[in-house]
Regions:
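Hydrophobic transmembrane alpha-helices that form the core helical bundles
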Residues: 80-112, 258-275
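Transmembrane alpha-helical segments of multi-pass small-molecule transport proteins
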Residues: 14-18, 84-89, 110-133, 145-156, ...
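Transmembrane helix-loop boundary segments of multi-pass membrane transporters
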Residues: 30-41, 105-119, 135-144, 237-249, ...
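Hydrophobic, small-residue-rich membrane helices and short re-entrant helix-turn-helix hairpins
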Residues: 4-6, 132-142, 168, 188-216, ...
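C-terminal membrane-solvent junction of multi-pass transporters and transport-like membrane proteins
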Residues: 5, 170, 322-339
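Membrane-interface "cap" regions at the ends of multi-pass membrane proteins
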Residues: 1-38, 50, 136, 174-179, ...
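Membrane-water interface regions at transmembrane-helix termini and the short interhelical loops
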Residues: 29-33, 59, 98, 102-110, ...
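Extracellular loop-to-transmembrane helix junctions
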Residues: 29-59, 73, 80-82, 214-216
């Protein structure tokens, strides 16, 4: 394990990148039937709930200096931790495939060279990121996040300043279901956050910044997706990019944002695999996960990820709830980190 500790800015940067993704924007479009007012309320409520749990999960790993799945072992024992680690690896393979699929679909919408080609391009770039390693990506991530921030501003301007009559709300999505869908995104990161907060110089502050930054950016992406569907009637991120006049620049940022986000999924899958089989090399497993995700993205259509998100919430929300109670109410299980 590298002894170098990460600073507050670095942690904020990591979770800014996690929040800016095609998947967040696409999920936001699902909330369009609620209308802007109720949709915004659902997004905010869902993210407050989800990010509070994300913060508490990150504090646990940060204080005891253990990865997400290692902290699970403290509450559920060796066998329990292996079960959740296996589930985590499986869901991260799924997320890797979904992110590659969505990114490739959007990229192909801008430059029609074939979705499978973009799947391969994104997959190869993710592997390159894994080989470089998370400790050597500082300057690259800074440039990437600055570019993604500018892109998000442009998308927001195009969507909300471009006019349009807007689509009327309907009853195809209930408010409760929308809140659950908004909660699902932060929950999907619960089994990952400790993989990063454990390396922070100031784990509690770093976790707070991570959760707040992710929450704000994720809400922003949801609103972009929902706004595009309601105001412009456009659900296709590629078409939004083209209408914004971004062209090749939009294409590059679609690919880049997909790589920087999906890298976290693959990297944490590798870390989780070490809980299952201690002899495995996390970096090698991360590469295998990326290959599997790339193949799945090529051969399997993943246009609607709602059910997958609900499944994640049903598995990991109870897990972290027990961990939170165990850590904050029954601290005797966690002597490390309390001095």
């Amino acid at each position: 394990m590298n002894e170098k500790r990460t600073g507050l800015f670095e942690n904020g940067l990591i979770w800014f990148g996690a929040g800016v993704s095609i998947a967040e924007i696409l999920t936001g479009t699902y909330l369009a039937p609620l209308g802007m007012g109720k949709g915004l309320a659902a997004i905010l409520i869902g993210h407050i709930i989800g990010c509070l749990m994300l913060f508490l999960a990150g504090v646990i790993g940060g204080r005891v200096r253990k990865s997400a799945m290692e902290t699970v072992k403290m509450s559920f024992g060796q066998k329990g931790s292996i079960l959740f680690a296996v589930l985590n690896v499986l869901q991260l393979v799924g997320w890797t495939a979904i992110m590659i699929y969505d990114g490739a679909l959007a990229a192909d919408g801008v430059m029609h060279t074939g979705r499978w080609i973009w799947c391969l391009v994104i997959g190869v770039l993710i592997i390159l990121w894994i080989v470089i390693g998370i400790t050597n990506l500082g300057k690259i991530n800074t440039v990437a996040m600055a570019a993604l921030f500018l892109l998000s501003l442009i998308l927001s301007k195009v969507i909300f300043a471009g006019g349009g009559a807007g689509a009327p709300s309907d009853d195809s999505m209930t408010f409760g279901a929308a809140v659950e869908l908004a909660v699902a995104m932060p929950l999907s990161w619960l089994p990952l956050i400790s993989d990063y907060t454990r390396e922070a110089k100031e784990p509690v502050k770093a976790t707070a910044i991570s959760a707040v930054v992710y929450g704000i950016v994720s809400c922003w992406m949801y609103v972009i997706g929902m706004g595009a569907a309601i105001i412009t009637g456009e659900y296709d991120i590629a078409q939004i990019m083209l209408k914004a006049g971004l062209g090749i620049a939009g294409l590059l940022i679609i690919v880049f944002s997909t790589v920087t986000t999906t890298f976290l999924d693959a990297y944490s899958a590798g870390i989780s695999s070490e809980t299952v089989v201690s002899k495995w090399n996390g970096k090698h497993v991360a590469i295998v996960v990326t290959v599997i995700g790339t193949i799945a993205a090529i051969v399997y259509p993943m246009d609607n990820i709602t059910d997958f998100l609900y499944l994640i919430g049903s598995v990991f929300a109870p897990m972290i709830a027990i961990q939170i109670a165990d850590f904050f109410l029954y601290r005797r299980r966690y002597h490390a980190g309390f001095g």
